[in-house]
Structure formats: structure tokens, C-alpha cells
A protein has these predicted regions:
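Glycine-/small-residue-rich active-site loops that bind phosphorylated ligands and cofactors
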Residues: 73, 88, 105-106, 136
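Conserved catalytic-core motifs of GNAT/GCN5-like acyltransferases
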Residues: 132, 145-163
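Conserved GNAT acetyl-CoA-binding A-motif
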Residues: 121-132
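Conserved acetyl-CoA-binding loop-helix of GNAT-fold acetyltransferases
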Residues: 97-100, 106-123, 141-146
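Conserved beta-strand-loop-alpha-helix junction that forms the acyl-donor binding cleft
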Residues: 131-141
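GNAT-family acyltransferases
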Residues: 1-95, 156-166
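Short aromatic/hydrophobic contact patches that present stacked aromatics
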Residues: 2, 97, 130-132
Length: 166
């Protein structure tokens, strides 16, 4: 599995994955789009701007949009790396949000995606990453713990874990 920035050549694979998330009415943490008004090329440009901190909503922070793929180029999931924390992210969202497409869950992809996402965080000088999950999401909790997460506390149904990035 590889985690990387999406490109134009990934359009079909990513659109198909997005359609699965929508069809299954599944949360897509780590991947942001408006299904009613989506243009892939604009999404790519918005991702580039968000990484540079340009033209983002006032309450957002610069972030890197990444997508995980298998060796054949099949899109597996999303990961969003926030380059700093604001008050909301410190309470609820953390540095990293991620999701694996419904048909590929339970196969270890989330664990590997978070591992690779933490390496990108390290490249961006984030040496201690906050990763959160709902108290109702034992699968995500297991992913975070498998990547070295240390529980700090639980706030309003959100478990907050810190991971030392090595």
C-alpha cells in the first residue's frame, strides 16, 4: 500500500471510491468533498491550495490531502494531515483524519495508512501527533493504539491520543 497525494491520473479510481462512500452512506474522515457539486480537477486544485494555506475557510488550517492505493492503483482510502492544530482540532479532530472505503475495511489498511501518514507528519516537523476517534469506534481505537497512541483523555465522546513520531 502506498499513501500519496492524488493526481489527475487517479481520477477514475478516486471517483469510484468516493461513489462507494456515498452509496454506503459511510463517513469519510480524512476526505472532504461536496457530492452535490464535485469537480475532480477543482478538488485537486483545492487540495494544493489547502496545503499552502491559501483560500481555506477561516476556521481551517493548512492540510495535506493524501489517498492510499494498492499496488494496482486501486484507491483504498483517504488521509488528511493537518499541519497545525486550532482549538477545534485540539479538542476533536487532531492532526490526522483517515478512513478506508467500506469494502476494504478490516484488512489492515487503516493501520498502514496511519503509519505512513505519521511519516509525512515527521517530514513536516510534527514530532508529536494528536489522533482522535469516537468512543464508539473500536476499530479506529485499535489502529491508533497499534501506531503507538497514548490516551490523554476523553472529551465529549472523543478519545484523544498522542503519538510520538519517530
Amino acid at each position: 500500500m502506498i499513501l500519496r497525494r492524488p493526481s489527475q491520473t487517479d481520477k477514475e479510481a478516486i471517483l469510484e471510491m468516493m461513489a462507494e462512500f456515498e452509496r454506503e452512506q459511510s463517513a469519510h474522515d480524512g476526505g472532504f468533498w461536496n457530492p452535490d457539486n464535485f469537480v475532480y480537477e477543482e478538488w485537486l486544485e483545492e487540495n494544493l491550495q489547502a496545503e499552502a494555506g491559501l483560500n481555506i475557510p477561516e476556521n481551517w488550517v493548512p492540510a495535506i490531502q493524501l489517498v492510499s492505493f494498492d499496488e494496482a492503483g486501486y484507491a483504498l482510502g483517504f488521509l488528511n494531515l493537518r499541519l497545525r492544530l486550532n482549538d477545534y482540532l485540539l479538542e476533536k479532530g487532531g492532526h490526522i483524519g483517515y478512513s478506508i472505503r467500506p469494502s476494504e475495511r478490516g484488512k489492515g489498511y487503516a493501520k498502514e495508512a496511519l503509519h505512513q501518514g505519521l511519516q509525512v507528519a515527521k517530514e513536516k516537523n510534527i514530532h508529536r501527533a494528536l489522533v482522535t476517534c469516537s468512543t464508539e469506534n473500536p476499530a479506529s481505537r485499535a489502529v491508533i493504539l497499534a501506531n503507538g497512541g497514548q490516551l490523554e483523555d476523553v472529551r465529549n465522546g472523543t478519545e484523544r491520543y498522542w503519538i510520538e513520531v519517530e
